Design a protein with these regions (language model features):
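Helix-rich terminal scaffold detector
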Residues: 2-31
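Residue-level marker of beta-strand positions
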Residues: 84, 136-137, 326, 333, ...
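C-terminal accessory/binding modules appended to enzymatic or scaffolding proteins
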Residues: 303-339
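Short, surface-exposed secondary-structure boundary micro-motifs
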Residues: 90, 143-144, 355-358
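Local cysteine-cluster metal-coordination motifs and their immediate loop/turn environment
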Residues: 336-361, 369-386
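Short flanking/linker segments adjacent to small metal-binding domains or redox-active Cys/His motifs
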Residues: 224, 382-398
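FNR/FR-type flavoprotein reductase catalytic core
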Residues: 1-10, 127-313
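Ferredoxin-reductase
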Residues: 36-137, 141, 154-158, 193-195, ...
Length: 398
C-alpha cells in the first residue's frame, strides 16, 4: 500500500496547489456577493485526475455494465475492497462527477473494474452505459472510500454482506477478495432485487457458491418473484431481514459477526434496525450510501457568509463562503486542509462539526441521524446559512 499512500499524498499536494490558485478568485467572488451582485453558481474545485483506458465492457444485466480500467501510464492500481473511483466527465460542455465502486478483487494490480447501473433520468449513468466502448479514456479521482476491508492471509472472519440492487458492487469486491485471500473466513450474502433479470453478477455468484460452499452462502430476495422462485419474496424490510438472519444463523448471531451493507436508504435503515434488535453492536456494522450526483442546490444564503475553520491543533482559516458554495469548496479556497473523497455526500470523509452557526444540507446523504444531531455536516454538500464556525479533522490518508 506504500505506493498508494505516496500517490494519495501527491493528490493532496495537487489539492493545495489548486486551492492556492483559486484563493484570489474566491476573494473577488466573496466581495461581489457581499455587495449584492449576482454571481454564477460556484464550480467544483479542479483536482488532479488519473487518465484510465477501458479495456473491457461486460454487460451484467440489461441495465448494468462493468468497465475494466487500466492506467494510461501503465502503473499498477492499488486499492482496498470497498473503495470507489469518482469519474469526472464532460457531457455537453458541463462537468459531472459520479462515484462508482470497484467490483473486482484487490488481488489484481494491473486493472480495476467498476460496475454501473443505468439510473432512470440519470444523465451520467445513461451516457456511460450507452456510449462507453473499449478504448475509451476516462478521467478519475481515487481510489478512495472508508467502506473497506483489508484481507489478510490466515485470518478467520464471519462476514455478512447485505446488498440491494447495484449496492452489490463494493460487496462483490469484498467477497472476491476475502474468498481469494482468507481461506478460513466465511461469508453470507443477502442480495435484494426487484426482478430476477436485475440480479447483477447472477451467474458468477452461483458459480462462486458452488466453488466455495460451505464458506459462501447466498440468500436472494426478490420483490417480483417468478412462480418457480424458491428464494425469499418481497422487500428486504425489518421482518424479512429478521427471517433471513434466523435462516442463516439460528436464534443467535455469531459473536464475531461483522456486517457490510450497501443499497437503498430504506433498505439499509430496515436492516440496521433488525440487526441491532438481534444484538449486533453498532460498531460491527458498516454501510455505504449510494447517492445521486452532485446536486443542483437552491442557494441557502443569498449573500456571502463569514466562515471560520478550526483545525484540531488550533490553527484557523477565516474568510467567506459564497452563496450556494459548499463548505468544502470554500475551505479549499481558503487553503484549509479539508478531508474529502467522493464530493457527492456519500462517503462521509468530509465530515465536519458545526461549532456555531447553521448550515443547509440536502438529503439523502451519508450521515447517520445521531451524527446530524451531534452537529456534524458533510462539507461537500453543506452550505452556510449564517455566519459559521466549523471544526475539521486532521488530514489523513484515504
Amino acid at each position: 500500500m506504500s505506493s498508494l499512500i505516496r500517490r494519495l499524498n501527491s493528490l493532496r499536494q495537487d489539492l493545495w496547489r489548486a486551492a492556492r490558485g483559486q484563493g484570489q478568485k474566491a476573494t473577488v467572488q466573496h466581495y461581489a456577493q457581499a455587495t449584492g451582485r449576482r454571481q454564477p453558481p460556484p464550480q467544483p474545485v479542479a483536482l488532479a485526475t488519473t487518465a484510465m483506458r477501458v479495456t473491457a465492457v461486460t454487460h451484467e444485466t440489461p441495465s448494468a455494465i462493468s468497465l475494466t480500467l487500466v492506467r494510461q501510464d501503465g502503473a499498477d492500481i492499488e486499492f482496498l475492497p470497498g473503495m470507489f473511483f469518482t469519474l469526472v466527465l464532460n457531457i455537453a460542455g458541463r462537468e459531472h462527477r459520479r462515484a462508482y465502486s470497484i467490483s473486482s478483487a484487490a488481488t489484481l494490480r494491473t486493472s480495476a473494474t467498476i460496475t454501473i447501473k443505468r439510473v432512470p433520468d440519470g444523465l451520467v449513468s445513461q451516457h456511460l452505459v450507452d456510449t462507453v466502448a473499449v478504448g475509451a479514456s476516462l478521467n478519475v479521482l481515487g481510489p478512495a472510500g472508508a467502506f473497506t476491508l483489508r484481507p489478510q492471509a490466515g485470518r478467520q472472519r464471519e462476514l455478512l454482506l447485505i446488498g440491494g440492487g447495484s449496492g452489490i458492487t463494493p460487496l462483490m469486491a469484498i467477497l472476491r477478495s476475502v474468498l481469494a485471500i482468507e481461506a478460513d473466513s466465511r461469508i453470507t450474502l443477502f442480495y435484494a432485487n426487484r426482478r430476477r433479470d436485475e440480479i447483477i453478477f447472477a451467474d458468477e455468484l452461483d458459480a462462486l457458491v458452488r466453488q466455495y460452499r460451505p464458506r459462501l452462502r447466498l440468500l436472494h430476495v426478490l420483490e417480483e418473484a417468478p412462480a418457480a422462485w424458491s428464494g425469499a419474496c418481497g422487500r428486504l424490510d425489518v421482518e424479512q431481514c429478521t427471517r433471513l438472519l434466523t435462516q442463516a444463523y439460528g436464534e443467535d448471531l455469531p459473536a464475531d459477526l461483522r456486517v457490510f451493507q450497501c443499497g437503498p436508504a430504506p433498505m439499509m435503515e430496515a436492516v440496521r434496525t433488525s440487526l441491532l434488535a438481534q444484538g449486533l453492536a453498532a460498531e460491527h456494522l458498516q454501510q455505504e450510501n449510494f447517492l445521486p450526483g452532485r446536486r443542483e442546490q437552491a442557494l441557502a444564503n443569498s449573500v456571502a457568509q463569514p466562515l471560520t475553520i478550526v483545525a484540531a491543533d488550533g490553527q484557523r482559516w477565516q474568510g467567506y463562503a459564497a452563496a450556494g458554495q459548499s463548505l468544502l469548496d470554500a475551505g479549499l479556497a481558503l487553503q484549509a486542509p479539508m478531508n474529502f473523497s467522493c464530493t457527492l455526500g456519500g462517503c462521509g470523509r468530509c465530515r465536519v462539526r458545526v461549532l456555531s452557526g447553521s448550515v443547509a444540507m440536502p438529503g439523502p446523504h451519508g450521515l447517520l441521524p445521531e451524527e446530524e444531531e451531534a452537529g456534524y455536516a458533510l462539507a461537500c454538500i453543506a452550505t452556510a446559512s449564517s455566519p459559521l464556525t466549523i471544526a475539521i479533522a486532521p488530514p489523513t490518508p484515504l
